[in-house]
Amino acid sequence: MSESSSLQARPVAAPLSSWQQAVSGQRRFGLIAHRLHRTGSDSALAQWARSSEDLVRQLGLQLVTVGAAFDALLNEELLVDYPGLHRLPNGREGGLMRVVSRIAGGLTPGEALDGVIFLMDPVDPSSTFPEAQALKRQCVTHGKPFVPTLAGALEWVWVEALVAGLAPERLGATAVAELDPADQTLALIAHDARKAQMVDFAGQHFDLLSRFESRVATGTTGGLLNELAWSRGWPAGQPWVTRYQSGPLGGDAQIAELVLDGACQKVIFFEDPHVARQHEADIQLMERAVWSAGARCSCLNSPAMAALWAQGLERIQPS
């Protein structure tokens, strides 16, 4: 079934409530999962759908789903008869390539996607295919969410609901507890052209970021962030972030090891997609570490994505 035919065959979604109408139209996300993450009732895709289905339906979130992930959902009787679930062809038939196009705007305005959930397995050969790399790059270029892990996918639906105006208590105690950063470590990384944006982001959301139990950063970015913190009244001489090496000298790999050890639960990584990067292998190593720890780690890859995340979490009062 193509996306167009699925739209014709399914009933119109119910009207949105007042808090849902705070979103400018129904948000549209691509949905993809590697084989590991879509196979079986305990797969990451199935876990995400079971946990998120009620909110997805309330939000009217449109899920433009590459074929195998679509079929896996129906096999597990998840999102059955949901009018916002649309099927694209399988990956080998161009489904993933179509998602890349639609992140860039698609061929018609109605096809454009607002972001992508792509549950990635770092040892799946297709994770290095050009279309997979292009999808992430286009998301970063256009400031749209690219969500590659189960932890991130669960969190992002909560963020969408909070930004839409849902009262935090209506998320439930489990979601609010998972969103609480008080026992988490945050990594902050920015390429040279994005360092000023990282400092600006940290300044705008300093109180939220200070709620994390601890923060780490690569070398130069960490130095700038500590200077910011001291200017904001953080105790003099006490680092706000723990600095590791700069990216080209191995800082990305050091943070990757923290992620693999379960000692870092969130990475905010402001990438510059427009320049060649000498330490590209190190960057991919760090990203793939996040995917490996996907049940407990999430990553925000652009200033726009991070700003939306912060907007949602700042609606939750610290415990």
PLM regions: where:
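Mid-chain, well-packed structural core segment of small domains
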Residues: 95-135, 249-284
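Glycine-rich, charge-decorated loop segments at or immediately adjacent to ligand/cofactor-binding or catalytic sites
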Residues: 72-76, 151-165, 225-228, 301-318
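Short, acidic/small-residue loops that bind anionic groups at enzyme active sites
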Residues: 132-157, 285-309
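Short internal beta-strands
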Residues: 59-73, 212-225
